[in-house]
From Swiss-Prot:
GO molecular function: proton-transporting ATP synthase activity, rotational mechanism
UniProt lineage: Bacteria, Pseudomonadati, Pseudomonadota, Gammaproteobacteria, Oceanospirillales
One Gene Ontology term, aspect cellular component: plasma membrane
Name used for this protein in its record: ATP synthase subunit a 2
Quaternary data: F-type ATPases have 2 components, CF(1) - the catalytic core - and CF(0) - the membrane proton channel. CF(1) has five subunits: alpha(3), beta(3), gamma(1), delta(1), epsilon(1). CF(0) has three main subunits: a(1), b(2) and c(9-12). The alpha and beta chains form an alternating ring which encloses part of the gamma chain. CF(1) is attached to CF(0) by a central stalk formed by the gamma and epsilon chains, while a peripheral stalk is formed by the delta and b chains.
Source taxon at top rank: Bacteria
Keyword annotations: ATP synthesis, Cell inner membrane, Cell membrane, CF(0), Hydrogen ion transport, Ion transport, Membrane, Transmembrane, Transmembrane helix, Transport
PANTHER family, per the entry: ATP SYNTHASE SUBUNIT A, CHLOROPLASTIC
Function statement: Key component of the proton channel; it plays a direct role in the translocation of protons across the membrane.
Gene Ontology BP annotations: proton motive force-driven plasma membrane ATP synthesis
Membrane-topology annotation of the record: Multi-pass membrane protein
NCBIfam families, sorted: ATP_synt_6_or_A, PRK05815.1-1
Cited Gene3D superfamilies: ATP synthase, F0 complex, subunit A (1.20.120.220)
Pfam families: ATP-synt_A
Length: 276
């Protein structure tokens, strides 16, 4: 938004708007130039920035861990190898303490979830104007939208939580069978005579799992990003006085939210493997 003096409201709205590509009723397939155009593109519009950054950070995770694995030695680890081993040991210990079934997929899944979400959350520490302004310079569009924190997009967090939800359903049916899975939904906690009430109660609890996973991660990171944006509106001296302490505190939020998402994923999948 160079060349203008936007109001505080316009500045905030601009930073919270995604780079959106979709089929506009009037302009056809194109990038949205306003928030209204993005809204008019409907459900099938794509948030290009969220998608791009999430894929790029996922690829970075794979590259870093593959590099550490290729260069791993039997001696005392150092540098990247040491960091990767600490992460693997931490996640492996968390899985062993929490997951009570037998499934070789759970530990790699938990490691992927934790590291991927951590990297996406970490983008919140990049100065709020740096990458968006760089993108505007590269594209030559001073009004271009560009969000760099994928987990501040509810579509990303909901997509991840739905993936966990489908795994819960899959393993519940695989371990307990269709009858056992349906029995959990209809025969608990009050027996067969209260089947409709059981289904309502258990169904709501099941659906609440992915929704709570998604909204918890989204809400915390969205609030953090909003505070960074508000700090950026302050005088230069105030930005330094407030942004550094908030960034230090926000590091805890970044790690904690990745850890919570990982642990709840392990817990939910452990429950799916319990055959009563």
């Amino acid at each position: 938004m160079a060349g203008e003096n936007p109001t505080a409201s316009e500045y905030i709205q601009h930073h919270l708007q995604n780079l959106t590509f979709g089929n506009h009723p009037e302009h056809g397939w194109s990038f949205a130039h306003t928030a209204q155009e993005a809204k008019e593109m409907g459900f099938w519009a794509v948030h290009v920035d969220s998608l791009g950054w999430s894929i790029a950070l996922g690829a970075l995770f794979v590259w870093l861990f593959r590099k550490a694995a290729v260069k791993a030695t039997s001696g005392v680890p150092s540098g990247l190898q040491n960091f990767v081993e600490i992460m693997v040991d931490f996640v492996d210990k968390s899985v062993k303490e929490t997951f009570h079934g037998k499934n070789a997929v759970i530990a790699p899944l938990a490691l992927t979830v934790f590291c991927w979400i951590f990297l996406m959350n970490l983008m919140d520490l990049v100065p709020v104007d740096f990458l968006p302004r760089l993108f505007q310079v590269i594209t030559g569009d001073d009004h271009a939208y560009f969000k760099v924190v994928p987990t501040t997009d509810v579509n990303v967090t909901l997509g991840m939580s739905l993936s966990v939800f489908f795994l819960i359903i899959y393993y519940s049916i695989k371990v307990k069978g269709v009858g056992g899975f349906l029995g959990e939904l209809t025969l608990q906690p009050f027996g067969k005579w209260m089947l409709p009430f059981n289904l309502l109660l258990e169904g709501v609890g099941l659906i609440a799992k992915p929704i709570s996973l998604a909204l918890r991660l989204f809400g915390n990171l969205y609030a953090g990003e909003l505070l960074f944006i508000l700090i950026a509106l302050m005088p230069f001296w105030a930005q330094w006085a407030l942004s550094v302490p908030w960034a230090i505190f926000h590091i805890l939020v970044i790690v904690l939210q990745a850890f919570i998402f990982m642990m709840l994923t392990i817990v939910y999948l452990s429950m799916a493997h319990e055959d009563h």
